[in-house]
Amino acid sequence: MVTTPRLVSLLLLLALCAAAAGALRLPPDASFPGAQAERLIRALNLLPKDSSSSSGRHGARVGEGNEDVAPGQLLERRVTLPGLPEGVADLGHHAGYYRLPNTHDARMFYFFFESRGKKEDPVVIWLTGGPGCSSELAVFYENGPFTIANNMSLVWNKFGWDKISNIIFVDQPTGTGFSYSSDDRDTRHDETGVSNDLYDFLQVFFKKHPEFIKNDFFITGESYAGHYIPAFASRVHQGNKKNEGTHINLKGFAIGNGLTDPAIQYKAYTDYALEMNLIQKADYERINKFIPPCEFAIKLCGTNGKASCMAAYMVCNTIFNSIMKLVGTKNYYDVRKECEGKLCYDFSNLEKFFGDKAVRQAIGVGDIEFVSCSTSVYQAMLTDWMRNLEVGIPALLEDGINVLIYAGEYDLICNWLGNSRWVHSMEWSGQKDFAKTAESSFLVDDAQAGVLKSHGALSFLKVHNAGHMVPMDQPKAALEMLRRFTQGKLKEAVPEEESSTTSFYAAM
C-alpha cells in the first residue's frame, strides 16, 4: 500500500490533535463552525441569516420599477435618508449596485459619501469583516456620517470619516448586507475572488466619478478585513503596474484589529489572556497544548489546500473557544465589558432601520432582504480563514505603499499582541530598523490616545481605551488617526481645516 505525503500529513495532524485532546477535550462545537458564526452574530443582537437560501434575495431586481443593470455596469442614485433633519441640502450621498462581471448574477451594494470638506480629500474604501458582515455596521455604528437613534431618526456623527475623506462602504463578499445573487455559484471562497470583485468595482466606480480619479486612494477596514485588505491592495497595485485599466492612486491601507497571520495570532491568544488576567497559569499551560497541532495544521493549509484548511480552522479555534469557556460573560470584543445574556453589543437598530419601507425606497434596494451578518458567507470562507495574508505585504512596502496596522488594546478576538507580533516578524528591508525604532505617544488633544511605532512605510498603533471596533470606542482618536495617516504625518498633530461645510455639520 502506498501512502501519499498528504495523507501522512493529515494522519499526523489527527494524531497530534488526539494527543492534545487527552489533556484538553475539544469543545462540542469545535467541528461545527456554523454554530460559532451564529453565536458571534447573536452577540451583536443581530439575526444570523443564510443568504444563499433567502428567497427574498433570489430573482429580485434593483430599485423601483424593477430596474436592472447590465453585467459590468453600475446603477447609482443620490440619497437623502429618512430620519435626517428637515431642510438638509443635497449632501453628496449615494447608494448603488454594481453588477459583477464574470459571475452568473452577482450584484454588489455600496454607499458613497462625498467629503464634508473638499473634493480633493482622499477616496477611502471601508471593508467590514466577519467574514460576511455588512459595512453598514460601520456606517451607522462606527465611522459613517450618522448614527441611528432609538426613535429611528439619524444623528450626525461629528467624527465620521466623511469629514476628511470621500468614503465608500461596500457590502462584500456576495451575500453580505444588500449584496446578492440569484445563483449560488457566485459565492466566494477565497481572496482571489473577493479582490477581483473589488478591483472590478473600483474600475467602474471611477468611471462613474472621474472627478475623484486623481485623488489619493486608501483601503481601510477591520477584523476579517485583515485578510481582504492585503489581497485587495495587491490586486490594485498589480493592476496599476500592468496598466490593466484606470490607474488607481493607491497610497496606503489601514487594518484595524485584523486577522492577517493566523499562525502568529492564534499563538498569542493565551499570552494575551494571561496578561489580562482572563485565565490562570494552569489554564494557560493546558490550552497551550493545542498550539503545536494548530501551527502544524496551518502549515498544511498553506500547502495542501481546502481539507487541511478546514481542519486548521477547527483545531485552532479550540484555543479561542477554550479561553471563552473560562472567561464567562466577558465581551471578547472588549474584555473590560460584560455581555448581557447572549448580547455583547446591541446593533439591532440597524435591522429595524433597513426594515423601513421609506429607507429601502430611498436607497433603491427593492425587496432585497438585508443580511447584517451572513452565516453562509462565513462558512463559504472557512477554507480561507487560516491562510497567511501577511505574505503579500512586504512587496507593497518595498514599492512605497504605506501600511498602518492599528489595534484597540482591550480586544481579545483579534488582539493587539498578536497583531504586533506578526508586524514585527514580517520580513522586509526595513524589518530591523522598525524593530529598533522607539515607540512614541500618539497624542490627541494633548492626551495620549495610543502608542505608535513607525519606520518607513510601516506603522503600528496600539489604541488606548478601545476594543475591537476602534472608531466606535474612540471616534475622535480614530478620525485623527485617519487624518494623519492619509497626510503622511502619523507622528504629528495635524490642524483640522475649517470650511463652511465643516461648520455646518459641527452645528448639527
Curated annotation (Swiss-Prot):
Molecular function in Gene Ontology: serine-type carboxypeptidase activity
Enzymatic reactions: Release of a C-terminal amino acid with broad specificity
Example of a GO biological process term: proteolysis
Carbohydrate attachment residues: 151
Keywords, comma-separated and alphabetical: Carboxypeptidase, Disulfide bond, Glycoprotein, Hydrolase, Protease, Secreted, Signal, Zymogen
InterPro entries in the cross-refs: AB_hydrolase_fold, Peptidase_S10, Ser_caboxypep_his_AS, Ser_caboxypep_ser_AS
Chain positions covered by the region annotation Disordered: 48-67
Subunit structure comment from the entry: Monomer.
Protein name: Serine carboxypeptidase 3
